[in-house]
């Protein structure tokens, strides 16, 4: 998806950036799940 390439171009592929990106994707996934439930 476009989100990954966007993050890669805007974030240095360091361990910290990768962790932040994974955390963001995880939170986004949880948000979409909640939206589906409601």
UniProtKB/Swiss-Prot annotation:
Keywords recorded for this protein, A-Z = Secreted, Toxin
Q: Does the entry feature the keyword Secreted, yes or no?
A: yes
Q: GO: which molecular function terms? A: toxin activity
> Could you say which residues form the signal peptide?
none
Query: Where does the record place it?
Result: Secreted
Quote the tissue specificity entry.
Expressed by the venom duct.
Cellular-component GO terms for this entry: extracellular region
Q: What else is known?
A: Turritoxin GpIAa was only sequenced until Lys-33.
Similarity remark: Belongs to the turripeptide family.
User: What name does this protein carry?
Assistant: Turripeptide GpIAa
Species annotation = Cryptogemma periscelida
């Amino acid at each position: 998806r476009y989100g990954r390439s966007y993050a890669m171009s805007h974030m240095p592929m360091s361990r910290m950036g990768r962790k932040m990106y994974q955390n963001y994707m995880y939170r986004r996934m949880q948000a979409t799940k909640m939206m589906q439930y409601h």
